[in-house]
Amino acid sequence: MAEKIAVIGAGSWGTTLADLLAKKGHEVTLWAYEPELVLEMRDTRENSLFLPGIKLNEGLAFTNDLAQAYRGCSMVLCVVPSQLVRRVMTNSLPFLPREAVIVSASKGIEVDTLATVSEIYQEILPPEQYRNLAALSGPSFAREVALEMPTAVTAAASTEAVARRVQEAFTTSYFRVYRNSDVVGVELGGAIKNVIAIAAGISDGLGFGSNTRAALITRGLAEMTRLGVAMGAQPSTFAGLAGMGDLVLTCTGDLSRNRSVGIQIGQGRTLSEILGEMRMVAEGVKTTESAYNLAKKLGVEMPIIEQMYQMLYQSKPAREAVLELMTRNLKAEGV
């Protein structure tokens, strides 16, 4: 079934998914905050700011008017940075069709409230509309999807009907969507992996090897799972695409913004220098702060997250943080 879809957020991932959906035959309008970006995409069929070199489907429409984006839509895909979800979706409420399925592809935890993205939606949306919420997450670099490289992700929703509808809307010959009912687990996997990816990048920047990276990924997965279980997620979710899959990709891939931030920190640059030069958002920086505070609030042990917080926000030297992780009290592996 062809959908009329509003895609909110024209970063690399939002633009890529809008293009994918348009190529599949859906009627798609991509909303961008910047009027000049809308004009460029209309004129050149390219998003040179966030997805350079990719020609966008001729059927894709562009706007910076929220009312126009939402008009008559049957599905909404929100792909704005997690710290902006509350503002953008609150502004969207007057225009949001009540029956529309809402797909969240934002990955993070709100700093001020420690709310996951679905919890933000729960606060904003009427109950009957919140039931139509799904989360889309998994190992998926935007550029690789834009180039139609085979990719698999997960769509999680509290109802089977919503999950199936999202699965059917997004699945193509190169983009395979699996269903899941664990919205909390899928969201947390997508959020926490960004913090671990910065840690893996720092390790690479310091010149440590594959052993160190493997340890960070594995113990990072344990921390992610502990936090998820404390919040009601299913442990098995973290062994899937939205957990281990996304974690491995983001900790090892050269297209990972979060890993790139970590590499530069490991090489001696300051966080403020790095962020000052970035056009796109590295979600893991803010998520480090929110995950650290959330773990403290829930009493969940997350030593990698704790050391990451001290490095990014308290100027702790990276080598000192690694030493502390390696000299903690000995324990059984477990989770």
Curated annotation (Swiss-Prot):
Catalytic class of the enzyme: oxidoreductase
Keyword list, A-Z: Cytoplasm, Lipid biosynthesis, Lipid metabolism, NAD, NADP, Nucleotide-binding, Oxidoreductase, Phospholipid biosynthesis, Phospholipid metabolism
Keyword Nucleotide-binding listed: yes
Annotated compartments: Cytoplasm
NCBIfam families: PRK00094.1-2, PRK00094.1-3, PRK00094.1-4
Function: Catalyzes the reduction of the glycolytic intermediate dihydroxyacetone phosphate (DHAP) to sn-glycerol 3-phosphate (G3P), the key precursor for phospholipid synthesis.
Family stated for the protein in its record: Belongs to the NAD-dependent glycerol-3-phosphate dehydrogenase family.
Name this polypeptide is given: Glycerol-3-phosphate dehydrogenase [NAD(P)+]
Species of provenance: Geobacter sp. (strain M21)
Gene that this polypeptide is encoded by: gpsA
